[in-house]
A protein has these predicted regions:
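Membrane-lumen (extracellular) interface motif
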Residues: 1, 108-144, 216-221, 236-252, ...
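Intramembrane catalytic core of multi-pass membrane enzymes that act on lipidic substrates
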Residues: 1-131, 135, 144-159
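Hydrophobic alpha-helical cores of multi-pass transmembrane domains in eukaryotic membrane proteins
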Residues: 1-9, 93-106, 141, 145-149, ...
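Structural signature of transmembrane alpha-helix termini at the membrane-water interface
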Residues: 9-16, 105, 109, 165-169, ...
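Residues in intrinsically disordered, low-complexity segments of regulatory proteins
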Residues: 52-55, 66, 267, 291, ...
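Short, charged/polar micro-motifs that form catalytic or ligand-binding hotspots
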Residues: 83-92, 144-151, 184, 192, ...
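Glycine- and small hydrophobic-enriched segments that form the cores of compact globular domains
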Residues: 124-138, 142-145, 149, 159-182, ...
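Membrane-interfacial catalytic/cofactor-binding modules of polytopic membrane enzymes
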Residues: 155, 164-240, 274-332
Length: 332
C-alpha cells in the first residue's frame, strides 16, 4: 500500500501526461521499449479496453519501460539480442533453474551456521556470544556476505518468474523485459551501485517523493538523503508486515547510512576533483556494504527471514540435484 501511495503521488504531480512509446517486436530500432534515437508516441484512438490495458501496464511497470514521461533511469542491456518470445521463455527458464540451485546452496550454507537460531523461522542474532570477538565477527561477516548474494538471487529470480508469466499470458515482447541488474558486484562506488548497477524498480518514487522535495531547501545532500530515507521507510514497512515488530533503526539505518556514503563520495569529488573509482573504490564500496550490511542482516535474522524455507525439503533444488547425480552414478 505504501508503494501504491508513492506511485499515486508521482502520477498526481507529473508535469505532463504519460504516453506509450513504440515497442520493439523484431529489431525495429527500439531499445528496451524506448526508441533508440527520437521517441515518438503511439497515435491511435483510445478505447476503454486500451485505456484499461495502459493503466494496468503503467501500474505494474515499475521502471516505466515503453513509456514517455517516466523518470529516466539506467536500463541494462542484455547480452543476448532476443527477439522471439519462445527464446526468451526458454532462456529465462534456464536462468531460473540456475538461480534456484544457487539460492538453495546459499540458503543451506547460511542455515548451517545457525541451525538452532537464525537458521530457523523462529530467528536469532547472527552475533554468537559464545565465540571470541574475532570468531564472532568473522562468522557474522560470512553470514552477511552470503545473505547479500541471496538477496540478489531472490530479487532476480522473482523478476525472471514475472518475465516468463507476462510473456506467456500477456504476450509481451522480450524488449519489455531487459535485465534487472547490471553486475552490481563490479561497482566501484556507492553512487554507481545505487544509481546504475542495482535494480532501479523504485527509483522514480524515491526521486519524485523523497529527493525532489528536499533538494529545493537542502541542496544536493538533502536530495540524496531524502531518497535513501524514503527507501529505508519502504523496507522497514516491509519488515513490519511480517507481524514480528519493527526495527526501524537497523533497517532504515542501513539505507540512511548508504545515503551518507553517497554524500561523502560527492564531497570527495568536490574536494579532490576526482571520482571514487578503481580498485580503491571497489574496496570502499564492498567495505561500506559489509559494515552496514551486518546491521540489516541481523534485523532480518532476528525476525526469521534468514531461516525461511522456500522449498519443501523433498523438492529443494540441491536435494533434487544430488538425487539425480546419485541415480546417474548408480546407472553408470
Amino acid at each position: 500500500m505504501f508503494l501504491i501511495a508513492m506511485r499515486s503521488t508521482v502520477w498526481v504531480f507529473a508535469r505532463r501526461p504519460y504516453t506509450r512509446l513504440p515497442i520493439s517486436k523484431s529489431g525495429n530500432g527500439t531499445i528496451n521499449g524506448r526508441d533508440g534515437d527520437t521517441p515518438t508516441t503511439i497515435e491511435h484512438g483510445v478505447t476503454v479496453f486500451s485505456a484499461m490495458w495502459n493503466a494496468w501496464d503503467l501500474m505494474v511497470n515499475l521502471r516505466g519501460i515503453g513509456w514517455d514521461g517516466v523518470q529516466m533511469m539506467h536500463i541494462p542491456t542484455s547480452n543476448f539480442q532476443v527477439e522471439s518470445r519462445l527464446t526468451l521463455v526458454l532462456l529465462t527458464l534456464g536462468r531460473l533453474t540456475i538461480l534456484g540451485l544457487v539460492f538453495d546452496i546459499l540458503s543451506r550454507c547460511v542455515h548451517s551456521l545457525g541451525p538452532d537460531t537464525f537458521g530457523t523461522p523462529k530467528g536469532g542474532s547472527i552475533f554468537d556470544p559464545s565465540l571470541t570477538l574475532p570468531e564472532r565477527y568473522m562468522k557474522s561477516f560470512i553470514i552477511t556476505l552470503l545473505s547479500g548474494f541471496t538477496s540478489y538471487v531472490t530479487i532476480d529470480g522473482t523478476y525472471q518468474v514475472h518475465a516468463v508469466l507476462f510473456t506467456i499470458l500477456f504476450q509481451q515482447y522480450p524488449s519489455q523485459w531487459p535485465p534487472l541488474f547490471d553486475s552490481p558486484w563490479l561497482s566501484t562506488s556507492l553512487t554507481s551501485f545505487w544509481g546504475r548497477r542495482w535494480h532501479q524498480l523504485f527509483r522514480e518514487c524515491f526521486v519524485a517523493v523523497g529527493s525532489k522535495p528536499l533538494e529545493r531547501y537542502l541542496g544536493r545532500a538533502g536530495s540524496i538523503m531524502g531518497a535513501f530515507a524514503l527507501s529505508g521507510v519502504l523496507h522497514d514497512i516491509g519488515i513490519q508486515g511480517m507481524g514480528r515488530g519493527a526495527d526501524t533503526l537497523s533497517v532504515a539505518g542501513f539505507f540512511v547510512m548508504h545515503g551518507v556514503g553517497v554524500v561523502m563520495e560527492h564531497a570527495w569529488k568536490q574536494t579532490t576533483g576526482r571520482r571514487v573509482g578503481g580498485i580503491t573504490g571497489w574496496l570502499w564500496t564492498f567495505s561500506w556494504h559489509v559494515l552496514w550490511g551486518h546491521v540489516i542482516v541481523d534485523a532480518w535474522a532476528r525476525r526469521g527471514m534468514v531461516g525461511v524455507g522456500f522449498f519443501p525439503d523433498a523438492y529443494r533444488p540441491t536435494t533434487l540435484f544430488l538425487n539425480w547425480m546419485s541415480r546417474k552414478n548408480v546407472a553408470s
